[in-house]
């Protein structure tokens, strides 16, 4: 949808066709033209930056809110293993080394009414935590940080944000850059 915007500093009057394309993608692509460490963004399964001359770091994060509201354990597990998979599939393959998460739930001690089709926030909390723990830590990828927020506004739908960090060599022994994937017929 088009958004009418007036810049408070310059007074410039403009229309924004897409907040994501205008305020996330465009500045990132503009920066990519100016720096040599931003290797791949908005293209493959995760973003890739040059860590040093020998290694690249990639990261992917996404939400799994609706699936986790319907099935807290399964929804959260598919969220974390999905971003693990995306790291493995970045470029010619990266090694997942760490997971991260942010969870927002209704208060676990909620005593108010709940619609028939909603789970109690404490059930959602326990299920999401277990799903991410089993999908990440128990598959050998440690969760190195996270956050939990409890607020009434998340009673109807939790926020389940999962991310994975991976590493990959900048170049393979044959000289190919590992973040560049060029599939051909028959692969």
Kindly give the residue locations of the regions a language model identified:
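Long, structured ligand/cofactor-binding scaffold of large enzymes
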Residues: 1-187
């Amino acid at each position: 949808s088009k958004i009418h915007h007036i810049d408070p500093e310059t007074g410039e009057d403009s229309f924004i066709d897409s907040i994501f394309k205008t305020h996330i993608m465009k500045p990132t692509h503009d920066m990519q033209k100016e720096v040599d460490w931003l290797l791949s963004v908005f293209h493959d399964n995760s973003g890739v930056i040059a860590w040093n001359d020998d290694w690249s770091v990639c990261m992917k994060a996404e939400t799994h809110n609706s699936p986790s509201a319907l099935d807290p354990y399964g929804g959260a597990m598919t969220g974390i293993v999905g971003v693990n998979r995306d790291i493995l599939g970045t470029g010619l393959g990266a090694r997942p080394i760490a997971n991260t998460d942010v969870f927002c739930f209704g208060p676990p001690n909620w005593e108010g009414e709940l619609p028939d089709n909603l789970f109690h926030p404490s059930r959602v909390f326990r299920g999401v935590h277990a799903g991410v723990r089993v999908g990440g830590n128990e598959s050998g990828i440690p969760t190195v940080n996270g956050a939990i927020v409890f607020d009434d506004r998340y009673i109807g739908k939790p926020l389940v944000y999962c991310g994975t960090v991976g590493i990959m060599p900048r170049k393979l022994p044959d000289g190919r850059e590992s973040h560049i994937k060029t599939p051909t017929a028959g692969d």
